[in-house]
Amino acid sequence: MASNSTADGKDRFFSALIYVIPLIDAFMFGGFLLQQFPVLQIIYLPIMPLLQFYYQFPFASFIIFIVLFMAVVRNNNISHFIRFNAMQAILIGILLSLFGLIVAYVIQPVFGQGLVTETLYNFAFLGALACGFFGIVQSVLGRYAEIPTISDAAYSQVRF
């Protein structure tokens, strides 16, 4: 779609900041990997206060979703660059939530807390980290982060 943009510094900053949400959502899947490789915990040191706030309130993720969707994605006064990145971060969060539900109610009852569950959690954690950091880097560079399928869904939801 659109690979380059004319995003100014403010748009780049806020677009990159929005991708902290998928990083926070991915934290719940990182338990196994963070125990095996404690050096990865460095990733979460800068956002630890946000992480504690986010998980302290049960409906924080839902409230943030509603606010981002209604106040940012659907607001035509905000640049398309920010709205697209907000929608993409929301979609990554939704995918992580759905994945968590599937693992909790389908995979774990069948396979237990074994290797399959641990592998799926590691996959979700690393995938979300990759998407989050890719989105941050692309936003800082002023480019649209083209993540297959997710970007297509984000483009279809964000009006020009």
Swiss-Prot record:
Protein topology in the membrane: Multi-pass membrane protein
Compartments where found: Cell membrane
Example of a GO cellular component annotation carried by this entry: plasma membrane
Principal location class: membrane
Keywords from the UniProt entry: Cell membrane, Membrane, Transmembrane, Transmembrane helix
Segments crossing the lipid bilayer: 13-33, 53-73, 87-107, 122-142
Family to which the UniProt record says this protein belongs: Belongs to the Tic20 family.
UniProt-recorded name of the protein: Tic20 family protein
